[in-house]
């Protein structure tokens, strides 16, 4: 079962999002840029749980960490903003993005610049409708150019791209978002996004959901994203954000 979802970015949301273009590093290896703003990222004290199964053990890494944030320090550099369509802030032991109108999207970035990365984060549905999308941003250059690897709270997944100021953040593939029983509906999910070379890969709970090839964007910031489709509102908690050098 599939469904098509194309989310328009309204002008009010574009104006509301706090974003900046990062120069990045175009060398063959990932490079970390200093965080934006005056806040310093605190060293997280958590230890990520080891995933179960052969694939999980293979990908469980405690070294090669480029950036991490457990969101215990509200000055670690992520946006703390309220808009007429939602908000982004540290809360509930993590980072919460709340969207309060249908057909809208909000995201946040920590102010980094990387090329090849593997990003992991825990997601928890807190409230609102499940016709949404939530996930990880990579290679974010500005509000017009980035990738978003997302799932929905009703069990769908997809990989999206914003490129050169197009009116829509479109999905790869003709089918839009695909359904998967790997995704825990209206619950907790462990997400992973690999942006390595020209390959973009989305994982949920240790299982590969989707992989696409695209060479449009080679570097940029990472981030978190939440949007609504028909849902009147949705609220997502993110915890334990880690960026690895693949």
Model-derived features: positions:
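Flexible glycan-contacting loops in extracellular carbohydrate-active proteins
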Residues: 212-240
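Localized edge beta-strand/strand-to-loop motifs within extracellular or lumenal beta-rich domains
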Residues: 187-201
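Ser/Thr-rich, Proline-interspersed low-complexity disordered segments
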Residues: 12-63, 246
């Amino acid at each position: 079962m599939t469904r098509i979802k194309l989310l328009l970015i309204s002008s009010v949301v574009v104006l509301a999002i706090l974003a900046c273009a990062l120069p990045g590093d175009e060398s063959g290896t990932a490079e970390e840029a200093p965080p934006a703003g005056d806040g310093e990222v605190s060293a997280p004290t958590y230890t990520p749980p080891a995933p179960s199964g052969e694939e999980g053990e293979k990908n469980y890494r405690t070294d090669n960490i480029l950036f991490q944030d457990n969101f215990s320090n509200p000055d670690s550099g992520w946006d703390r903003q309220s808009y007429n369509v939602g908000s982004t802030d540290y809360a509930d032991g993590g980072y919460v993005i709340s969207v309060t109108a249908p057909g809208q999207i909000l995201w946040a970035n920590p102010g980094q610049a990387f090329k090849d990365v593997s990003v992991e984060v825990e997601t928890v549905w807190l409230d609102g409708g499940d016709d949404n999308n939530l996930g990880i941003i990579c290679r974010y250059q500005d509000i017009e150019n980035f990738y978003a690897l997302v799932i929905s709270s009703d069990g769908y997944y997809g990989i999206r791209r914003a490129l050169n100021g197009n009116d829509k953040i479109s999905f790869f593939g003709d089918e839009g978002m695909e359904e998967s029983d790997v995704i825990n509906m209206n619950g907790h999910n462990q997400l992973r996004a690999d942006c390595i070379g020209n390959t973009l890969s989305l994982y949920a709970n240790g299982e590969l959901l989707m992989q696409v090839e695209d060479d449009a964007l080679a570097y940029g910031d990472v981030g978190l994203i939440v949007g609504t489709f028909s849902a009147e509102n949705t609220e997502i908690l993110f915890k334990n954000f880690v960026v690895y050098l693949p």
